[in-house]
Each structure stands twice: as C-alpha cells, then as structure tokens.
Amino acid sequence: MKIWYILGILLASAFLSSAQENNSGKVIYEQVVKLEIKLEGDAAQYADMLPKERKTNKVLYFNPEESLYENGKSEAPDPMQMQHGGSNVMIRMEEPDNKVYTALNDTKQIEQREFMSRVFLIERKTENQWKLTGKQKMILDYPCQEAEMEKDSSRITAWFTPVIQSQAGPGSYNGLPGLILAIDTDNGKNTITAQSVDFSELPKDALQKPDKGKKVTQEEFDAIVAEKMKEMGVENGGKTGGTHMMIQIKR
C-alpha cells in the first residue's frame, strides 16, 4: 500500500510539473477562409476568376497572463494575371498587418486592424459565452474537448486542451479552461487549426501590445469598412477573412 501511495504522489507531481511547464509558448495555426465576394456593375463579369478560399499562417504567443495573435510567415502569392473579353485582368491579394492582444486575467483586448492603408486600434472586452458539448478528439496528440457559442449571428465551435493550462486562443477567442487548438465558424466558412505547439522560452518582445493606429470602437470601424466597400461596389464588406483583394483591369 505504501509503495502505491508513493507512486501516486510521484505521478501527480510529474503531471503538475508538466502542466506548469506547458503554460507558455507559441502555436502556429493555419487559417482557411472561404471567400464570399459579390461584385456589381462591370466588375461582376470577373467574379468567376476569383479564388474560392484563402490559406494563411498565423502565430499565437501566450503565457498565463496574456497572449498575442498575429500573422505568421506566409509566402505572398504571385498576382493572378489573365485575359477576359479583350481586357488584361490582374488579381492581387494582400494580408493586412492585423494583431490581437489579450489580457487574459480581465479579458481586455486591443486589436490592430489595417484597412485600405490605414491602421486602427480597437479596444474591447471579450464576451465569449461558451457551452461545453462533451465531445472529445485529438489534435496534435493533445486530448481536446469541444465548446460552442453563438456570436454575431455565427456559430463558433472551439476545440481546447486542458493539458495546456492557458485560456488563450486564436484571434478574439479565449476564456476556456485550456488552450484553444482549433476554431470552426459556420461549418467550415472560416477554420483555424493548430499545426504545431512550441514551449520554448518566448522572446522578450513577443507579447508587446499594439500601439499604432487610430483608436476607434468596433462599431466605428465596422461603419468605416461598410462605407468604403459600398463605394467600391462590394456587398457585405467583401468577406475575405481580413485579406485585401485588389482587381486591376486594363483594356
């Protein structure tokens, strides 16, 4: 009996030590966004040339108190050039320099958003009302649990692992009892999936708060985007997952 008791203490100590070591690090994610772009007027004839999805790499730096989510290293795709109806068409996609900083203890977020060469800072409190479903699966050999919520008319599904004791997650998603390794919005319209987890010591400047840009509320930023998209003849803000898409036509 004494031997089993000692063994139990050693196993518990090992698990606690591992959990403590696994609360700080870096996660590389792949984001896949299904592109929904509606063009009006003369531009509508080029709709069938546009890509149907966009893949990018993202990185999350985290520790028990804070996290920073930003662009990872992705090769910029070459512009698509083609001819259509006697016109030369070039389509170029650019990834804006967006970042999301989260203070995990009070769920305060500072988001840096780049739009049409302008940079904005949006401060807010996160209100993620998660509900656990009881479903489980493995991601990168980590046991994960499923949680869901409704937010901004979208259904969000998250997979988090209690093995990594951080409430951080990609983008604005956080607040679960473990690191979020995957997000699915509206059955695959926007997915974010962890590709690797690294517990190496973070650089000292890895968790710097964004401080460049014009301070606006979320409502003000949404209005700016909607107005500009309306001027350009793009409906619904041109849902490209934050990617800037430019179409140049030469006749």
Give the predicted meaning of each segment.
Residues 20-251:
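Extended soluble regions of mature proteins
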